[in-house]
Amino acid sequence: QLNLIKGLSDDAYFSKPIITSYPRGFEVINLENEEFKLDSIDDLVYSIAYRKDSMFMRDLFSRQIGRPLKTDQPVHGYLLAAGCLFADGCFVEEVPYDPNYYFYGEEISMMLRAFTKGFSIFHTPNIPIFHLYNNDPETSGRQLHWNPDEDKNRITKWHELEKQSIQRLTDLIEA
């Protein structure tokens, strides 16, 4: 990924590339014994697109989805995955993480701010990160942010944080 960033950034048109994708998945086989099954066979490029069933589902927020493409070459894109991106170190200074986003709105905000700072988004095959897409706490050994047990100890509940996040995204877009 680092060599690809270097190669892309040598092109004056794409001098500030971001490599991003929704990572391939993995399954927990046995958490106690640290046994996992990685989806390492899938080497397609996954572009990120808006989900047709979730366009503007909450004000200006639309959900995203990874879409497989039949290519082994990098693809120029427009959306990013906040949990999986590679870029030059200047990215964290020019597009700093905004802690006022809570789940919804984070990726769209980051993409808009990156675009306005001259960054270009690319999706590539074989991203070296895997993600647990399983929501079952029994299998994964973790609670998710919307779990009632997690939420009861918060001063501000997750649904209120989500509402504030979507309003922040709306304010960014309408500014």
What are these regions (language model features)?
Residues 16, 82-84, 100, 118:
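Beta-strand-rich binding-surface signature
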Residues 61-86:
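A recurrent flexible, glycine/aromatic-enriched loop bordering the glycosyltransferase active site
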Residues 83-96, 175:
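Extended amphipathic secondary-structure runs
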Residues 1-56, 120:
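Conserved donor NDP-sugar-binding/catalytic core segment of glycosyltransferases
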Residues 90-123, 127-130:
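Donor nucleotide-sugar recognition loop
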Residues 74-76, 96-101, 156-157:
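Active-site rim elements
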